[in-house]
Amino acid sequence: MKKYLWLWWAVCVGHIQAQEVLIKHDVSHLNVIEGKEIERPIEVDIELFKENLLPLQERFYIPLEAKPIIYGYTKRYLSYKWIGKVIGLSDYYFPLFDKKIRQYELPYDIKYLAIVESALNPRATSPVGAKGLWQFMPATGDHMGLKYNSYLNIFYDPMANTDSAMRYLKQLYERYNDWLLAISAYNCGAGNVDKAIRRARTNDYWQVRKYLPKETQAYVPTFLAITYVFYNYRDYNIEPPIFKYQFTDFVIATTTKAGSIKEVAEWYNTPENVFRFANPQILTNYVPKGTIIYALGKE
């Protein structure tokens, strides 16, 4: 019986991989991160995959099931040579995400959605114009309070972008009372999810899924696969790089005068390269007076 179940999974996974839609990532920001890259795709044993899922299913607030499509996307992400660098980078951003998750009383595992959205690139910009760690479209971002000008783009501000994402996700969950549907709506909009629910005549995500746009059909399984990878990467001998700082090590300050990035970094006792990394929202070498910044020290 076990042999036949394995064959069924293999057939399902093969069919899924032939039809899968991949979430595209711009990972150029990872080039500056020193760390060991995966040299060849990692083998993902089906039985180990199922075994590792059991404790997650018990503690995971968002439903995580042992479905072939999730296994398929897990294999895909464990084939990316950069996955270890993203795991390392998460140690820098996740304390910020956890802080905002606590503030808005959301499930902690929602933070893995940012990997799907941007691979933790604070300046990520999609072909359709979505921006930042959590990939806000201009209209949605404007509604959530994200602004920009020639000097600053608050879409790229890690804290502002994350705060807006948590508020928006909370609104979507309150609308659907189902995290998989809320996550789908984050990707394709509530209107498309509502339409899919009407066509499916149910609000069960796995039955609604086939009526969603193609990319959104891949979105939730990708999120669940990434969650699995982040919880179990040690089992696959992935060695993420270690960062010296976390985003929450920086204090929030408002500049009292204008200056160059180099000058402002010196005023706030922060190495220039660290200051630039912590403040991707600053677009030029000029920092206007009254700019909210993140620094290691006070002026």
Segments and roles (model prediction):
Residues 1-23:
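Bacterial Sec-dependent N-terminal signal peptides
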Residues 15-105:
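An acidic, Gly/Ser/Thr/Pro-rich helix-cap/linker signature
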Residues 79, 83-94, 103-106, 126-134, ...:
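Solvent-exposed, acidic/flexible segments
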Residues 106-123, 182-187, 275-279:
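Short, functionally critical alpha-helical segments immediately adjacent to catalytic or ligand/cofactor-binding
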Residues 128-150, 162-165, 169, 193:
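Substrate-binding/active-site groove segments that recognize
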Residues 169-196:
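Catalytic and binding regions of secreted/periplasmic enzymes and modules that target cell-wall glycans
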Residues 211-212, 274-299:
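Extracellular LysM carbohydrate-binding repeats and other cell-envelope/extracellular binding modules
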